[in-house]
């Protein structure tokens, strides 16, 4: 992390709420004070190419790692009930060879074909859970003169029927502007002008005014690929030894929530722990461990993406009421804000929002402060 900072990544130490602008629904999370444990909330913000360059360099320096460039895996290799390696092709010389392995890990993301490979070898279809693509988004890399924006990030989520905005500082005075919009409201903005119009309507004037001085870098990127898919390898009664999938190849989340790399990192830690315990039944143990990390995030996203029920049942009304009370309290109380950010950042599990001491804090804050809405949803 120190190397990323030294190379120019934007750093927020997590100890100053003035560096963040967060609006959830109609509530601005702008309490005064400092977090009790700012370290886990520190953010090192950089573009994906910047991050991947530095990660690859660090990994390549490891004595136990060899990177084979310009190779493509064409298919895994099997004997009996075990994957023993992969067939690869050298793209520069068009030469095919085999690479033996005790464990093959598929991290090819959304394009993974492991499920099709397993089905073609008689293991049956892999069951999966899905959430629909109800959003689209557009993003644009910008260069903004230093000092024009005090915050390092602005995040606005107005709910599932109004546009959302993320503006995030990157390395070397570059910023990423992303605008999300429900498909039923027209989908992602089609050009930078449309993005700016939406941003100016939603962002605070002190932030949006800086966008007048922004210089676009490259073209906007638009996507409607916001569906979620969790391939339930953990539900399979039988799988071959020696092969597993990880990251988006296992579970693709709605990218608007910004959880993909964190959940993939948690899966890597789960795999490390499984390997440290030995290779016996490693595939099944890994999928079971990974599911424990994925399940609460998947459930939380499913609830957030679900259309509002006009006649919710009592448990749903209670949950929604607690969520609104927590957000309202977070506009005043740094303790509540810290807990919300820790859960959103997957540092703490969602169950921490049901902690009795937190509920008491929310109640006390609500009683001390009159109900007020600080902003309204803007279409």
Each predicted region: which residue ranges?
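Primarily hydrophobic membrane-targeting regions of prokaryotic envelope proteins
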Residues: 53-60, 72, 106, 118, ...
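Helix-loop-beta segment of a Rossmann-like dinucleotide-binding subdomain
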Residues: 29-48, 85, 179-183
């Amino acid at each position: 992390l120190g190397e990323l900072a030294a190379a120019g990544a934007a750093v927020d130490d997590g100890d100053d709420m003035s560096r963040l602008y967060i609006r959830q629904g109609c509530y601005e999370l702008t309490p005064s004070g400092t977090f009790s444990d700012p370290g886990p909330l520190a953010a090192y913000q950089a573009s994906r190419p910047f991050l991947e360059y530095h990660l690859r360099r660090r990994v390549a320096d490891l004595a136990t790692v060899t990177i084979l460039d310009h190779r493509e895996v064409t298919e895994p290799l099997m004997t009996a009930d075990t994957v023993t390696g992969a067939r690869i092709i050298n793209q520069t010389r068009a030469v095919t060879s085999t690479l033996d392995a005790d464990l093959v890990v598929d991290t090819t993301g959304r394009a993974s074909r492991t499920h099709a490979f397993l089905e073609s070898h008689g293991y049956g279809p892999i069951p999966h859970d899905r959430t629909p693509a109800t959003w689209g988004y557009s993003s644009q890399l910008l260069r903004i003169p230093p000092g024009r924006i005090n915050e390092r990030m602005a995040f606005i989520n107005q709910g599932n029927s109004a546009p959302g905005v993320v503006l995030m500082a990157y390395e070397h005075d570059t910023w990423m502007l992303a605008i999300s919009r429900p498909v039923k409201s027209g989908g992602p903005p089609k050009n930078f002008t449309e993005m700016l119009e939406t941003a100016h309507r939603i962002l605070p004037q002190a932030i949006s005014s800086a966008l007048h001085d922004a210089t676009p870098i490259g073209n906007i990127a638009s996507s409607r690929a916001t569906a979620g898919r969790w391939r339930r390898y953990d539900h399979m009664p039988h799988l071959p030894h020696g092969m597993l999938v990880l990251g988006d190849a296992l579970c693709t989340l709605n990218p608007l929530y910004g959880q993909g790399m964190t959940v993939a990192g948690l899966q890597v830690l789960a795999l490390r722990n499984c390997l440290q315990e030995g290779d016996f039944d490693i595939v099944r143990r890994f999928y079971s461990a990974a599911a424990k990390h994925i399940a609460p995030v998947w459930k939380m996203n499913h609830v957030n993406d679900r259309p509002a029920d006009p006649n919710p049942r009592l448990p749903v009304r209670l949950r929604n009421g607690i969520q609104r009370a927590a957000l309202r309290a977070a506009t005043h109380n740094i303790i509540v804000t810290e807990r919300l950010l820790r859960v959103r950042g997957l540092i703490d599990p969602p169950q921490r929002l049901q902690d009795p001491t937190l509920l008491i804090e929310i109640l006390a804050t609500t009683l001390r402060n009159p109900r007020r809405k600080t902003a309204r949803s803007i279409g």
